Amino acid sequence: MQKELLEVFDNRFPDRDYTIEIVNPEFTSVCPITGLPDFGTITIRYIPDKVCVELKSLKYYYLEFRNAGIFYENVTNTILDHLVDLLKPRTLTVTTAWKARGGITETVTVSYSAGQDE
């Protein structure tokens, strides 16, 4: 996944804590074992510091996963790592909720907080 696709814009309210929530209910990737498509909802919640993620660039970044063979846990952690590196937010949480496969669903959540050991 090319994190270079992600763009930012300046946060006009860097002295205020506020939460941004971004939801993509149409995320797709590919199971690395079966080669079958995986469908999920990606939710990003963060408190920005100096910059915010630009949504069109995030959309194109997500498309990079469409044909990638990658496990749910790797999707979730990769998105978190790339966004933390880019945004340097105060806090950031990524939750991926995957559609049922064989009657089983999975939700993966990973969080970052500025100042925590990485």
Swiss-Prot record:
Belongs to the GTP cyclohydrolase I family. QueF type 1 subfamily. Keywords: Cytoplasm, NADP, Oxidoreductase, Queuosine biosynthesis. The keyword Chloroplast does not apply. This is NADPH-dependent 7-cyano-7-deazaguanine reductase. Pathway: tRNA modification; tRNA-queuosine biosynthesis. Its EC number is 1.7.1.13. Disulfide bonds: none annotated. One of its GO terms (biological process) is tRNA modification. One of its GO terms (cellular component) is cytoplasm.
